[in-house]
Amino acid sequence: MELPFSAMSLLYLLVGIAGVISHQCYFRRGEHHLYPFAYLRWYTLIITAPTVVVSIVWGLPLYDAAKATGGWALTYFAGLYTSLLLYRVQFHPLHGFPGPYGARISGLWLSMGLRDRPAFQKLQELHNQYGPIVRVGPSELSIAYPEAVGIVYGHQSRCYKSTFYDNGHPMKSLHSYRDRAAHDQRRRTWSTGFGDRALRGYETRVHEYRQKLFTRLNDAVGLTVNISDWFNFYSYDVMGDLAFGRSFNMLDTHSNHWAIQVLLDGIVLYKYFVPSWLFRCFVTLPSLSKNWHRFVEFTTQKLVHRMNDKLEIPDICASLLAPLNGRSPTPDEFNLLMGDAMLVVTAGSDTTATALTSVVYELARHPEDVERLRAELLPIDADANGEYRHEQISNLPHLNGFINETLRLHPPVPSVIPRITPAEGVHVKGTHIPGGMAVFCPQWVIGRSDAAFIAPLSFNPERWYKHPDLIKHRSAYAPFLTGPYSCIGKPLALMNIRTTIARLIMTFEIRFPAGEDGSHLMENVEDHFSMGIERMPVVLTRRG
């Protein structure tokens, strides 16, 4: 049995229209990123079932029936993607915003552009070419106006977290909460772990690992050492101790713990900032997620051990366990505890190691500032090992200015921290940005912008305490973010950075290896949400 030509044409037309309608009424609205393989299964079923029906009703061999339904499927997708492309190119709310033509069509345009450079460099190039607001995806804008930081991230902002934060679904942590009320409630639990009393306890716990770090650095005096490696070993050992009550022993083994290596291998995918639906495809494939499941199992064991330990000096996990009042957690509570413990390790280690490495880079480039820092520290008593108590050095102006200036030029999270605009949209410098759009303010670009700072490319710590006129928009400086989702671990990170750098400059002379002036060392930096500095060679010599 065959349908008349006119009937067959009408059928194809209706199928094509169905594709258009599915885009306009469904895929264009709401979020559809969590279960990409569910759509694949549904489409497979929708194609397979009609094939069987056509074969039975029309009496066709399955092959011929499959050709017919395959044609319908192609027509459906032709309608869907024609509607999608026309909408994105011509009728999208962001149609009038400048940016590369390819970015209008697909979120993969930016990902493809990151094959040979990190995101923060690519975004700098785009802003240099197109201006302060650039369309970098079908529904994504990068905004380099200093005023936008408060509008997008500030306490009064009505913007909310994007689908990017669902990449680890179903695992939850403080970082991944998209619902503001749920996030605020969880943050209150976390906040008890970052008060002054808790920080003094952490300072005591950290001393052990800093002593190991300096023992290793002493062993390498006069040699070229990759300081980035040692800061990574140190930071992961510290945060392992604060998350689980036990370190990863990386300073002892001089290498990455296997679980940390799995973690580092896994974050490579983040450097491409692929759309959330595609990220979900990768992480749900068994062949690609096998190591991730090993890491989760390892974390589960570490958390169970920690829950059974009684620590003399509390760690961060003690604050997270306190609401349980000694009872066993429910499965949901355990998953949240595990997500938060992993957050302590990942967020606290990578960013702190990068910040320390960046500070050393600038110390080696600016020996005159090193002398000023030493003059500031000289009147302050250190212990026999050269350790300074944080409360003694926390308000030193040049030390804080040096750290601030380093983080301005080398922000640990340099580019994409995405938010969704509220339904009514937002206004930035007289420009209306429609609701439901993903926006972000790249700290790397803004930190080097003459709209935010005078002489933005010059390294001048005094701008933070002696020459405030060199800062046009103080609120644009947000290396730890700002607003309700700002980094809750900022006090711990700054304590660690200040005390480590103070001891470092009072113990060693720091210089680049012979023939190296440091001008190219920051060219091979990665951006996988947080900045990654794989190689930073320096030579340390003992001070007299």
Curated annotation (Swiss-Prot):
One of its GO terms (cellular component) is membrane. It is a multi-pass membrane protein. Pfam families: p450. Keywords: Alkaloid metabolism, Glycoprotein, Heme, Iron, Membrane, Metal-binding, Monooxygenase, Oxidoreductase, Signal, Transmembrane, Transmembrane helix. InterPro entries: Cyt_P450, Cyt_P450_E_grp-I, Cyt_P450_sf, Cytochrome_P450_monoxygenase. GO terms for biological process: alkaloid metabolic process; secondary metabolite biosynthetic process. It is found in: Membrane. The keyword Signal applies. Its EC number is 1.-.-.-. The keyword RNA-binding does not apply. SUPFAM superfamilies: Cytochrome P450 (SSF48264). Pathway: Alkaloid biosynthesis. Residues 1-22 form the signal peptide. The chain crosses the membrane at residues 42-62, 66-86. Its main location: membrane. Heme binds at residue 487. Belongs to the cytochrome P450 family. Cytochrome P450 monooxygenase; part of the gene cluster that mediates the biosynthesis of notoamide, a fungal indole alkaloid that belongs to a family of natural products containing a characteristic bicyclo[2.2.2]diazaoctane core. The first step of notoamide biosynthesis involves coupling of L-proline and L-tryptophan by the bimodular NRPS notE', to produce cyclo-L-tryptophan-L-proline called brevianamide F. This is Cytochrome P450 monooxygenase notG'. It comes from Aspergillus versicolor. The lineage of its organism: Eukaryota, Fungi, Dikarya, Ascomycota, Pezizomycotina.
